């Protein structure tokens, strides 16, 4: 064998080994690519599902927040309506002193006080109302209605209009809340 043949033989052997190594590593590279592509696809699917679940959860949270905010706004509006209704009721009750029925109401208060506390009870009323009631004493703190004390001062009836309103205010508020349409 000549030197040229030996070199050819070595070159051929080298080329065959290079080709064999290339084939072997090409297969490995292809397998790695497929494995990586599969993992990438799996990860993409996982995160796509996770994203959809997160979006669904976020949407649910936002819907719940909107419902809560809506209820809160409705409740606040109802509170405003009830407050306005109570203010109007208070205004009308306090202005009953200007009505034609007020003298009759005042007489009824006095009669109840006398029946409950006795003939000798002390009655206090506003200056203008005291003039309408026999033996009543004027009290500038009273804007309408009366306060009556038993002779021994152990019992009292408070028929002042603002006290009456305070006593019925919670019931009125409940009534208004129940009758407000949603």
UniProtKB/Swiss-Prot annotation:
Designated name of the protein: A-type ATP synthase subunit E
Record family assignment: Belongs to the V-ATPase E subunit family.
Species lineage: Archaea, Methanobacteriati, Thermoplasmatota, Thermoplasmata, Thermoplasmatales
InterPro entries according to UniProt: ATPase_E_C, ATPase_V1_Esu
Molecular functions per Gene Ontology: ATP binding; proton-transporting ATP synthase activity, rotational mechanism; proton-transporting ATPase activity, rotational mechanism
The keyword Membrane belongs to this UniProt entry's keyword annotation: yes
Keyword Ion transport set for record: yes
HAMAP family: ATP_synth_E_arch (MF_00311)
Keywords: ATP synthesis, Cell membrane, Hydrogen ion transport, Ion transport, Membrane, Transport
SUPFAM superfamilies recorded: V-type ATPase subunit E-like
């Amino acid at each position: 064998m000549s030197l040229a043949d030996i070199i050819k033989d070595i070159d051929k052997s080298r080329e065959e080994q290079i080709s064999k190594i290339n084939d072997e590593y090409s297969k490995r590279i292809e397998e790695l690519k497929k494995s990586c592509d599969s993992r990438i696809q799996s990860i993409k699917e996982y995160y796509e599902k996770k994203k959809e679940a997160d979006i669904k959860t976020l949407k649910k949270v936002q819907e719940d927040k909107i419902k809560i905010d809506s209820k809160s706004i409705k409740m606040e509006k109802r509170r405003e309506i009830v407050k306005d209704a109570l203010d109007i009721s208070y205004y009308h009750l306090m202005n009953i002193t200007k009505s034609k029925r007020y003298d009759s109401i005042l007489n009824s208060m006095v009669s109840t006080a006398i029946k409950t506390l006795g003939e000798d009870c002390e009655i206090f009323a506003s200056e203008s109302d005291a003039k309408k009631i026999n033996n009543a004493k004027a009290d500038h703190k009273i804007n309408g209605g009366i306060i009556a004390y038993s002779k021994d001062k152990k019992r009292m009836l408070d028929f002042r209009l603002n006290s009456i309103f305070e006593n019925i205010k919670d019931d009125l508020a409940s009534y208004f809340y129940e009758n407000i349409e949603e």
